């Protein structure tokens, strides 16, 4: 079966419904539940592995920073909700997750991984995909890492802040932009103000 990616930047993000572990309980979660909020949707290969807990714990520990931006963070793997719960119930010192501040979604059918173009078909697991979806449900950013390298929570947070800034102000954010930094007015004459200051 060939993977047909339905996730395209600038287009509506593929809708999904999945069982998640939320605050230690099972709950059905849909993308549409988060309408009006930004969503950082990140895929990881498998529970009870090595890089994955470092990413999940890092996102969970900083969930409040995303919430301040009206943004939810959702983790997804091809494991079942039962495996997610077992991993959450395993102490961090033993390679577990411990209590989390973010939901973990179960993608046992691999439909979500396939729709978002991160399914590694020969192994039946997901690559490390990260998707930023805006409050209108439009996919704004995609990053997909190969399996051995984790992602940066700082960069995910910066991307949400940058897209929210451009949405609100109509200006564009240069490379490495952080809140409070200069932005660029997106027309030939006004952009010279930025370039004359920074070159």
Swiss-Prot record:
The active site is at 52 (cysteine sulfenic acid (-soh) intermediate). Its EC number is 1.11.1.24. The keyword Acetylation applies. One of its GO terms (molecular function) is thioredoxin peroxidase activity. One of its GO terms (biological process) is response to oxidative stress. The modification Phosphothreonine is found at residue 183. The enzyme can be inactivated by further oxidation of the cysteine sulfenic acid (C(P)-SOH) to sulphinic acid (C(P)-SO2H) instead of its condensation to a disulfide bond. It can be reactivated by forming a transient disulfide bond with sulfiredoxin SRXN1, which reduces the cysteine sulfinic acid in an ATP- and Mg-dependent manner. Acetylation increases resistance to transition to high molecular-mass complexes. Deacetylated by HDAC6 which decreases reducing activity. It is found in: Cytoplasm. Keywords: Acetylation, Antioxidant, Cytoplasm, Disulfide bond, Oxidoreductase, Peroxidase, Phosphoprotein, Redox-active center. Pfam families: 1-cysPrx_C, AhpC-TSA. The modification N6-acetyllysine is found at residue 197. It is an enzyme of class 1 (oxidoreductase). It catalyses: a hydroperoxide + [thioredoxin]-dithiol = an alcohol + [thioredoxin]-disulfide + H2O. Residues 7-165 form the Thioredoxin domain. The modification Phosphoserine is found at residue 113. The keyword Oxidoreductase applies. One of its GO terms (cellular component) is cytosol. Thiol-specific peroxidase that catalyzes the reduction of hydrogen peroxide and organic hydroperoxides to water and alcohols, respectively. Plays a role in cell protection against oxidative stress by detoxifying peroxides and as sensor of hydrogen peroxide-mediated signaling events. Might participate in the signaling cascades of growth factors and tumor necrosis factor-alpha by regulating the intracellular concentrations of H(2)O(2). The active site is a conserved redox-active cysteine residue, the peroxidatic cysteine (C(P)), which makes the nucleophilic attack on the peroxide substrate. The peroxide oxidizes the C(P)-SH to cysteine sulfenic acid (C(P)-SOH), which then reacts with another cysteine residue, the resolving cysteine (C(R)), to form a disulfide bridge. The disulfide is subsequently reduced by an appropriate electron donor to complete the catalytic cycle. In this typical 2-Cys peroxiredoxin, C(R) is provided by the other dimeric subunit to form an intersubunit disulfide. Homodimer; disulfide-linked, upon oxidation. 5 homodimers assemble to form a ring-like decamer. Interacts with TIPIN. Belongs to the peroxiredoxin family. AhpC/Prx1 subfamily. This is Peroxiredoxin-2. It comes from Bos taurus (Bovine). The gene is PRDX2.
């Amino acid at each position: 079966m060939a993977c047909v990616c339905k996730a395209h930047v600038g287009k509506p993000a593929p809708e999904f419904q999945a069982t998640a572990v939320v605050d230690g309980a099972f709950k059905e979660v849909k993308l549409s539940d988060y309408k009006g909020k930004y969503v950082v949707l990140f895929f990881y290969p498998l529970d009870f592995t090595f890089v994955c807990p470092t990413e999940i714990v890092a996102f969970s520990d900083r969930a409040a920073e995303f919430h301040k931006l009206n943004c939810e963070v959702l983790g997804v793997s091809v494991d079942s909700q039962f495996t997610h719960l077992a991993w959450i119930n395993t102490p961090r010192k033993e390679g577990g997750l411990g209590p989390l501040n973010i939901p973990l979604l179960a993608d046992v059918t691999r439909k979500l991984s396939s729709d978002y173009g991160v399914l590694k078909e020969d192994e039946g697991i997901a690559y490390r995909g990260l998707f930023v979806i805006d409050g209108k449900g439009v996919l704004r950013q995609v990053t997909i890492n190969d399996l051995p390298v984790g992602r940066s929570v700082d960069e995910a947070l910066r991307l949400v802040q940058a897209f929210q800034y451009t949405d609100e102000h109509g200006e564009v954010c240069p490379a490495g932009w952080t809140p409070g930094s200069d932005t660029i007015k997106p027309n030939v004459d006004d952009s010279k103000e930025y370039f004359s200051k920074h070159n």
